[in-house]
Amino acid sequence: MSLCSLAFTLFLTVVAGIKCNVTDVCAGSPGIPGAPGNHGLPGRDGRDGVKGDPGPPGPMGPPGGMPGLPGRDGLPGAPGAPGERGDKGEPGERGLPGFPAYLDEELQTELYEIKHQILQTMGVLSLQGSMLSVGDKVFSTNGQSVNFDTIKEMCTRAGGNIAVPRTPEENEAIASIAKKYNNYVYLGMIEDQTPGDFHYLDGASVNYTNWYPGEPRGQGKEKCVEMYTDGTWNDRGCLQYRLAVCEF
């Protein structure tokens, strides 16, 4: 058989084995796989993936440049709370002795001027009848009339004491002030627990008296002593208003 006849016979055999449906679509047997094709063109970029975990820290970089200039001073802060009181220090060394006061001419001049001013003031007040000097005592009044306790407080605040005569001369000085102001004067003494016995405010016993005849006769009910304008004394209650006279 020639090659052409053999080929034709095979063709008919293949055609005879093919089944066709009424739609004239024939289903052939799977053919032999062809050779792989060439690579296609690159596809488009895909979507961004999910964020990954942080990587490990990188190595330390090289040193930086030179440090900058110092900045300006800031504003002062608020004062802090006071600290605790420290311990008392040791006494310092004794200083050199100073010059005697009588050698300081400037000090002597100042003292002389002060003394002169005091004497002038005392002279003016004496002329007004509000102050009298007897020995080393000075008796003075501000012209107010108040009770015994108030007079005592006023005199203490002024640096003195309520006036009390301890000699006839002092008694006369206080009496002249009482007569000038036409008012009785409380004296700086008070009755003891024993009626008729009196003592000074410092606790000492009275060593000079000038009672009006028949006085004292308060029988313990009149604890204070007043001076009349003629200089005589009388025991009296301490709540009356009398001229305030102090002694310095």
Curated annotation (Swiss-Prot):
Comp. bias (Basic and acidic residues): 42-51, 84-93
GO terms (BP aspect): cellular response to mechanical stimulus; cellular response to nitric oxide; circadian rhythm; opsonization; positive regulation of phagocytosis; respiratory gaseous exchange by respiratory system; response to epidermal growth factor; response to glucocorticoid
PROSITE patterns: C_TYPE_LECTIN_1, C_TYPE_LECTIN_2
Annotated InterPro entries: C-type_lectin-like, C-type_lectin-like/link_sf, C-type_lectin_CS, Ca-dependent_lectin, Collectin_CTLD, CTDL_fold
Additional facts recorded: Pulmonary surfactant consists of 90% lipid and 10% protein. There are 4 surfactant-associated proteins: 2 collagenous, carbohydrate-binding glycoproteins (SP-A and SP-D) and 2 small hydrophobic proteins (SP-B and SP-C).
UniProt: Ca(2+) binding residues: E215, R217, N234, D235
GO cellular component: collagen trimer; extracellular space; multivesicular body
Organism lineage string: Eukaryota, Metazoa, Chordata, Craniata, Vertebrata
Organism of origin: Rattus norvegicus (Rat)
Oligomer and partners: Oligomeric complex of 6 set of homotrimers.
Domain C-type lectin, first and last residues per copy: 133-248
The protein, known as: Pulmonary surfactant-associated protein A
Disulfide bonds: C155-C246, C224-C238
Keywords, sorted A to Z: Calcium, Collagen, Disulfide bond, Extracellular matrix, Gaseous exchange, Glycoprotein, Hydroxylation, Lectin, Metal-binding, Repeat, Secreted, Signal, Surface film
Region: Disordered, residue numbers: 31-99
Keyword Nucleotidyltransferase attached: no
